[in-house]
């Protein structure tokens, strides 16, 4: 089984891949873990990890800067119902809109809004 960690220019991809590989080994799973920005790799994958580090806007821009990536993710998640795991800002992108820097459209897989926390 192929598990793709989507490389769209944000996140600590090496740490994520190593963590998944360790869990794979420790639990006798049979995943091949690949970090890739190639749309065809997403298409061929069995499971997808969408990491994210930084702002909502920067993350969605990273996805949109790779031709065909958002469309392929939508196809795999919404139509094929392929399992996807979001990490940090990667999961926030599942929402309709994010307001961290400015109003920014997300992937709209989960209806909702991501708002900036005012902690102080």
Residue spans for each PLM region:
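N-terminal beta1-alpha1 cap of cysteine-dependent amidohydrolase-like domains
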Residues: 1-83, 89, 108-118
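Glycine-rich nucleophile elbow surrounding the catalytic serine of serine-hydrolase chemistry
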Residues: 88, 92-94
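Short beta-strand-to-turn element immediately C-terminal to the catalytic PLP-Schiff-base lysine
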Residues: 95-96, 111
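Short, well-ordered secondary-structure micro-motifs
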Residues: 96-97, 119-120
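Conserved hydrolase catalytic core segment
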Residues: 98-103
């Amino acid at each position: 089984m192929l598990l793709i960690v989507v490389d769209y220019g944000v996140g600590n991809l090496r740490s994520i891949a190593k963590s998944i590989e360790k869990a794979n080994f420790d639990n006798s799973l049979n995943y091949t873990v690949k970090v890739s920005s190639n749309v065809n790799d997403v298409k061929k994958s069995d499971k997808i990890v969408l990491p994210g580090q930084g702002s909502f806007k920067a993350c969605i821009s990273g996805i949109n800067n790779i031709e065909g990536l958002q469309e392929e993710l939508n196809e795999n998640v919404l139509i094929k119902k392929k399992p996807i795991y979001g990490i940090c800002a990667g999961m926030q992108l599942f929402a309709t809109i994010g307001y961290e820097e400015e109003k920014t459209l997300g992937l709209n897989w989960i209806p909702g809004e991501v708002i900036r926390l005012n902690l102080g």
